[in-house]
């Protein structure tokens, strides 16, 4: 059996069928993110943010594929507003946030925030308001789609609520600005616990804490201290600490050295995109944000690509695979595996691929090919 086939069997089999786990931060005990919603045939309601640019097109692909696969889901759609909602201080409406809180699960297309316009980031608003503390991104080589690496199979887990993304910036004097990096014990323990629980639940053997504590001794030092505390509770899992610059070099040289990586916010933003580049880009990379009380918001992390919006050229793979993560969260494992296999097989065959994957198919044609595999 070829390396690609072996990898495909692993991805579509054991690890990928596991559900995401959450952590009860008050007790430290593990709880299932896949809440006992209902059986796999009872319809549930999920919030859908089609997003900007190509978002509505790839969201339509998801709806079509889910319908073809017989997924018992009803979508509650919310769009970005045209004016800032004072309750959220962004273009996201309060009603859309309440929808996710009520449904406990959602899927989000790409959302664009104008740079330097004084608007609160839409993605940051979602993470903060919904307390989505962990961003989980599986990164794996796709059989049949050739990149520089054939054996990538790792998970990045990013602390999602603090660090340099706390939004605490100000001008000290003219020409001098200051940004505060916030690291707390509570948030660090929470994401570390999630990372080790994820590793244990998914049969992963190693957790790497990524840091720059040699320079930022207080902030990253606290993060590492919390990771060490949690690691002691999981002796069966190998724990290591890797300085972020060395981590980048090691990932590019040999990504197979890593399994699960956990890190503060900014490092996670950078490393997760680097990992996506190892397997073909953000257009192939799923993502899911985990919150407390069983909330999960899966998302496509690529841009809104306004230059091709409305031209039927967008690649829906990332949003589809994120939708698969959402289905596993909901315990719709059978439909999740069917859709996952259909996506993998369509890309592997190579007959129908969008332009970014080296093909000439439209969004509609690519989506239809996936549906045909179902």
Swiss-Prot record:
EC primary class: oxidoreductase
Gene3D superfamilies, per database record: Isopropylmalate Dehydrogenase
Binding site for substrate: 127, 137, 158, 245
Tissue: Ubiquitous.
Keywords: Magnesium, Manganese, Metal-binding, Mitochondrion, NAD, Oxidoreductase, Transit peptide, Tricarboxylic acid cycle
One MF annotation (Gene Ontology) recorded for this entry: isocitrate dehydrogenase (NAD+) activity
Gene Ontology CC terms: mitochondrion; plasma membrane
Cofactor(s) required for function per UniProt: Mg(2+); Mn(2+)
EC numbers on record: 1.1.1.41
One Pfam family named in its UniProt record: Iso_dh
Family note: Belongs to the isocitrate and isopropylmalate dehydrogenases family.
Name of the coding gene: IDH5
Transit peptide residue numbers: 1-44
Record organism: Arabidopsis thaliana
Catalytic activity: D-threo-isocitrate + NAD(+) = 2-oxoglutarate + CO2 + NADH
Domain of life where this protein originates: Eukaryota
Position of the signal peptide: none
Assembly: Heterooligomer of catalytic and regulatory subunits.
A single BP term in Gene Ontology: tricarboxylic acid cycle
Main location (coarse class): mitochondrion
Entry note: cofactor: Binds 1 Mg(2+) or Mn(2+) ion per subunit.
Subcellular location: Mitochondrion
Binding site for Mg(2+): 245, 269, 273
Name under which the protein is recorded: Isocitrate dehydrogenase [NAD] catalytic subunit 5, mitochondrial
Positions of the record's site feature: Critical for catalysis: 165, 212
